[in-house]
Amino acid sequence: IREGDNSLVSLKDKGYDTVAMHPYLANGWNRSKVYEKLGFDKIMFLNDFKQEKVVRSYVSDEEFYETIISQFEKKEKETPLFVFGISMQNHGGYVNESFENTVKATNLNREYGDLNQYPSLIHITDEALPTFINYFKNYDEDTIIVFFGDHIEFDKYKIPFFIWSNFTSEEKNMGLTSINFLSTMMLEEAGITMSPYYKFLAGVQKQIPAIHAYGYFDGNDYHKSNAVEIANNEVLNDYWLLQYANVFGDFKGSKLFN
């Protein structure tokens, strides 16, 4: 990660204040240095949370949501705010004996502690989420929430996500996609003018809705990818070249990506 690398922190150029928060240790994955290089205006880690509502020694999602809300209550009224938050409550592993599982799997020939604990934790999140959403339902500025995970179901590489806003009542199934397209989807929902790079991603998504490290989904079938197949696929090859330029090229200050 280098200073000025492309990310949604570039919303600062459109007048946004930007906040990154993660209720755990600042040195994990060098997050403190990475967030600083990305240019966030404010960075919050474990010591910046009250730590009054804890689940399995982690800050609960309830407190995490409350802390996000507090940032919106403190912000300047005329200044839009972008918050990137990574929660901690439901992080693995899932065999903490001090935690009381409220969800129990039945009709099994043996006990699977993690099979009970993970859905029990998700249930706690489900109970906290409506209060969070309801706060922004009544918020006096247009607001979008993008909610997704990245740590589960390794065999399927599929996890649920949703994009919610307080200014539209339309519901639609977004279909199968991948995490690299979520930022573009959010910008489109917000009606924010996108850079050429994000416009390119929007075009890629229409032809290849989902991509990950081992393959891609073309809307009909799943394909395992390799260097030869990427080179022979014009869309994938263009994406690979542009992504390489994004990561390794010198485009600081360029409007191509940000």
Predicted regions and their residues:
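Solvent-exposed soluble domains appended to multi-pass membrane proteins
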Residues: 1-258
